[in-house]
């Protein structure tokens, strides 16, 4: 691989990982001691498959809204531009297993959802690009492989 880059994920050998997985991608400590924990939540195998944008977009909305019902430590859930996963960030919450539980509970909530939150032109920048059914399929697939989430390299 090339020289070390500033972006953590650019230093990850994407040919060596095996999706699905959840890995701690980085930590940051603020000037007042607060700590941010960023997780790579990988739904699809890099460079082999990806999430279709309407499903990914709806899953982002659903997870961003529903996860906050289970924790006040969530900072953000952001989709990856490569459409293979999300970044999930917490503040002052360094419990990996609990982060997995929050994710699992949130995805279970997605399966029960009857609408996509903020799926309108006032609250969303591309309201026409959503798929509740697609989001549910992604959540169901990821949950079905929960036993693999801790195994980043398929060992």
From Swiss-Prot:
GO biological process entries: quorum sensing
Reaction equations catalysed: S-(5-deoxy-D-ribos-5-yl)-L-homocysteine = (S)-4,5-dihydroxypentane-2,3-dione + L-homocysteine
Keyword annotations: Autoinducer synthesis, Iron, Lyase, Metal-binding, Quorum sensing
Cofactor, how bound (note): Binds 1 Fe cation per subunit.
Reported cofactor(s): Fe cation
InterPro entries with a match to the protein in the record: LuxS_sf (IPR037005), Metalloenz_LuxS/M16 (IPR011249), S-ribosylhomocysteinase (IPR003815)
Annotated Fe cation binding sites: 57, 61, 124
The organism's place on the tree of life at top rank: Bacteria
Coiled-coil boundaries: none
EC number assigned by the record: 4.4.1.21
One MF annotation (Gene Ontology) recorded for this entry: iron ion binding
A Pfam match: LuxS
The protein's assembly and partners: Homodimer.
PANTHER family: S-RIBOSYLHOMOCYSTEINE LYASE
Family from the record: Belongs to the LuxS family.
Purpose of the protein: Involved in the synthesis of autoinducer 2 (AI-2) which is secreted by bacteria and is used to communicate both the cell density and the metabolic potential of the environment. The regulation of gene expression in response to changes in cell density is called quorum sensing. Catalyzes the transformation of S-ribosylhomocysteine (RHC) to homocysteine (HC) and 4,5-dihydroxy-2,3-pentadione (DPD).
Protein name: S-ribosylhomocysteine lyase
């Amino acid at each position: 691989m090339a020289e070390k880059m500033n972006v953590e994920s650019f230093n990850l050998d994407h040919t060596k990982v095996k999706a699905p997985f959840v890995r701690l991608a980085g930590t940051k400590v603020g000037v007042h001691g607060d700590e941010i924990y960023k997780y790579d939540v990988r739904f699809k195998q890099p460079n082999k498959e990806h999430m279709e944008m309407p499903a990914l977009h709806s899953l982002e909305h659903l997870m961003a809204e529903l996860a906050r019902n289970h924790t006040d430590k969530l900072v953000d859930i952001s989709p990856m531009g490569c459409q293979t996963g999300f970044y999930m960030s917490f503040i002052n919450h360094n419990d990996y297993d609990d982060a997995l539980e929050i994710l699992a509970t949130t995805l279970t909530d997605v399966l029960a959802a009857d609408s996509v939150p903020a799926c309108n032109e006032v609250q969303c920048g591309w309201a026409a690009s959503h798929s509740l059914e697609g989001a549910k399929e992604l959540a169901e697939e990821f949950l079905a492989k929960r036993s693999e989430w801790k195994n980043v390299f398929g060992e």
